Amino acid sequence: MLIMPVIVLFYKENGLSMQDIMLLQALYSLALVIFEVPSGYFSDTIGRRNSLVAGSILCTFGFFIYSLSYSFSGFLCAEMILGFGYSFISGTDSALLYDTLLEAEKEKDFTRKQGRLSATANFSEAAAGILGGIIAVSSLRLNFYIETGIIALSIPVALSIVEPKTHKNLKPKITYKGFCNIIRETFSDPPLFWLIACNAVILASTLTIVWFVQPYLEISGIPLIMFGIIWTVLNLSVGAASLSADKLKNILGNKFSFILPVILIITGYFSLSFMNLKWAFALFILLYIARGYTLPVFTNRINLQIPSERRATVLSIRVLLTRLIFCIVGPVSGYISDCFSLRTGLLFAGTSFLLLGTISLAGLLKYQNRLK
């Protein structure tokens, strides 16, 4: 995305504080929390393709509103639409990939394929980072105009998708009882619940750090044009971690493949809170590696526990928990950053993720032998 390397600067240019920025993102997360699981159920019942088309249209409209907005209220309206739109996409994309591989009897390749998909997305974002940084020198808003056009291209792509027979043949019906049953079964299954919970904590921590990178670079005196280059390197590290996730998981084994990302995020946050600014870039890379490694590894293990007719809904529950955690940690850490310092905000976030990570990891390790 062209906007991400400089989005915090864009917010500040339009009068938002760090607390405002974190609150805005928390409200976006709240929109995802509200719509995420119902839209996942929509994907499981109406179809993956239809869900992706709806999400693409809504996201295009959301970015269009963003490009015309100049205040917190305008940005909030855009974020609500984007939250609604993205809820149709998140979970559905991974479910579509897994069901396609399942139909071809290649589901064992999911971690590698998901890693490649994540890597491709991050390599694309890395390239966009350089371009976004260059464009931002002339105008921060211009990135939003161009981004709207790029997102619009996803609509014809979504329309061209062929639904896998694995899902088409199921033809489940939309019922409130069926929806509630999936929720209840997920939360009453300890191995699956703790797997999702641990993954959600890790993803929430890597989501939170994204909003600290640009302010950290700003107080370090980094030139604006370098923001895009740094963003590019960070996304390349995510892509590289995603590509190597399958091999690294096989080397580490199941237990340590769960422990590694938790160690990385805790080390990264606390080191950023106490160490010299010159080491910040290496520490950000550490956290971004955790992000790239986690998605394919945990998503594969979650997929192994659930049937196709529940897949998108359960994967959406993971996103719901991720955003719920961010809704709490994000705004509070932003408020602390405004009132005290950026490092103090990072320390609060790190302490929160240490506590949540330890609890969820302990639960996961307790039940790991019952996972498929």
Residue ranges and their predicted role:
Residues I34-G47, A136, A240-N254, S337-D338:
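Helix-to-loop junctions at the C-terminal end of transmembrane segments
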Residues V162-A197:
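Juxtamembrane intracellular "pre-TM" segments in multi-pass secondary transporters
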Residues I57-Y70, F75, I263-N276:
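C-terminal ends and interior cores of transmembrane alpha-helices
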Residues V33-Y70:
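Conserved MFS/SLC helix-loop-helix module at the cytosolic interface between two early adjacent transmembrane helices
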Residues M80-N122:
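Cytoplasmic helix-loop-helix junction between adjacent transmembrane helices
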Residues L140-N143, E147-I174, A362-K372:
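Helix-loop junctions on the cytosolic side of multi-pass membrane transporters
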Residues M1-I34, D189-T232:
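Helix-loop boundary and gating motifs at the non-cytosolic
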Residues K255-F298:
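C-terminal transmembrane helical hairpin of 12-TM major facilitator-type secondary transporters
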